Amino acid sequence: MDRAMAADEIARLRKEIERHNYLYYVEAEPVISDYEFDRLLEQLIALERLHPDLVTPDSPSLRVGGQITRSFPSVRHREPMLSLSNTYSMEEVADFYRRVRRLLLDEGIGEQEMVAELKFDGVAVSLIYRNGLLVQGATRGDGVQGDDITVNLRTISSIPLRLETSASETLSGSDREIEVRGEVFMPKEDFDRLNEGRPEEDRFANPRNATAGTLKLQDSAEVARRRMTFVAYFLKGIGDQHMPHFDRLKLLGKLGFFTGDHYRLCPELHDIERFIGEWSEKRWKLPYETDGVVLKLNAVWLWERLGATSKSPRWAIAYKYPAQQAITELLGVVFQVGRLGTITPVAELRPVKLAGSTVSRSTLHNFDEIERLGVRVHDRVVVEKSGEVIPKIIRVAEDSGSLFSVPIVVPERCPSCDTPLTRPENEVSWYCPNEEGCPAQIRGRMLHYASRNAMDIQSLGIALVDQLVGRGLVKDPGDLYSLQLPQLEPLERMGTKSSINLVRAIEESRTKSYDRLLYALGIRHVGQATARELAGAYPYFASLHEAGEQELAEVPDIGPVVARSIIDFFSKPWVQAMLDKLEQAGLPMRAGKEKEQVNNNFEGQSVIFTGGLERHVRQEAEEMVRERGGRIVSSVSKKTSLVVAGKEAGSKLERALKLGVRVIGEDEFEAML
């Protein structure tokens, strides 16, 4: 095929692929299978590899990802991206409606309509299109400036790389540069798929956290694999300044954007109340998370006249649905065994509908929590779900009073290996001491070792680990590196191809960094931050292994408790046997070349995060501090340089204020990056 023919075929494939993207992500009416779509994309990628000069910025092949981004530069928004005022009260919604009408009447303007839209629980972004082509995508940041994440946003199939030609031609000549604002979110099914197979401690709490963390990943190929969606909720920069907001939403749909479709023009207050009431239940049937309703004045040309406070506009408000609760019966309690031997009680509930799904289980955390709640088997309990995947029991129902309720008894023996349980002094949890032989602990250690933040062996999921442990093929992570195809192929859902993929993934884990190996070992109290401190203080594994307790305790962020835990870990014969296997397998036993530093904005500073961050996943924010020369610590002292306080910050914030340690919010933290 000559160049001219290739150019024609590339153009045809691009048009066809984008048409199917639109039908799938915007219209929700696919006409071909995923396999057929993948074949079209493969054909395009193959042709572009043969003719790299024909690759353009709007090619659908860019959605596959693969680019590694060292950092995300800051960009200033054309106009501030203000957050909306929130309310959980219908009375405050009515007050907002009347206040806007009164302000307009004072200006001599008659009654105006409102637009009600579903509030998507995601991450706000801004997209800039120049001459119909996507040129920039940025996070909201502090509202004034955000991070340029264009390379990651290009992987989202519901974001047009080029605006739909037929609709874009209706824009005037002055519309050469427009801005589209909206929300990136992760559909429920894709979120469940992302969490599936991850160990408990490595799972995302909710789709919003997963989205925020994914958008800041440096590997765009991984971003593409996680399948997020974009919903557009405002169009700025068009020539017709008097185009109502409702009409702008319609135009966004014609330009190729998903707009959610569930929005309504509301002339009167009762129309708003009806919309909110309708969607309080209907929202659970949607394939994505919505947590409220946004109300905006339809007359966009009046927004500037109404103005804004320092934080939010006066022409819009967000009504948020309250946390969902249900009352059901506690049927029983099962006891799970974690990788460190911790016994966790889990409530088995009479199935009840809650937040759009059937709930039959809830964590009880520990036995002190059971005592605090005063809960017994066969009690009627109040279960709440608010943004998290796992619901929680918040209290015993007032009308419980069952004559048949019985106390929850602490088990005497491990439910996995039947070893007598122990409870260390000053701890709330019970433990199984059979570390080497308990199947549940072995399973947990294997999953932790293979998890994303450890050795990242993606082919090693829960079902496969259960088979490997159950058949005695592995007793610790060191056994992974001696697995052979004949051992793997007979396993359920494996076969030759899957077995080869697993062996390849295990081989690739040998190249992971020394600090990740230290974290993957699963030493009690040694998280990712502590593993990095240890790797920095002891760049050779042999020196760490030989270090004394007092010496370890003097390492920053270690202290006597962690030091004792490290010494105890290395003193166990089964641990030594595992380490010998890992060393023989060629795992990194010393630190490699240090990661390149982005800048020195946190040079020499010890930083701690407390509370929930709105725009970052905690581990991603901590990594940003390290990339800029800072050090993450786990407790507040007079030596702490900076405390970044998010929502519902607790005792660490109080201690910082008492000690006079500098405290900043998420906005100021982003500005420091």
UniProtKB/Swiss-Prot annotation:
Sequence positions that bind Zn(2+): 414, 417, 432, 438
Enzyme nomenclature, EC number: 6.5.1.2
Organism: Chlorobium limicola (strain DSM 245 / NBRC 103803 / 6330)
Keywords recorded for this protein, A-Z: DNA damage, DNA repair, DNA replication, Ligase, Magnesium, Manganese, Metal-binding, NAD, Zinc
Protein name: DNA ligase
Gene that produces this protein: ligA
GO cellular component terms given for this protein: cytosol
UniProt-annotated binding residues for NAD(+): 34-38, 83-84, 117, 140, 183, 296, 320
The keyword Nucleus is assigned to this record: no
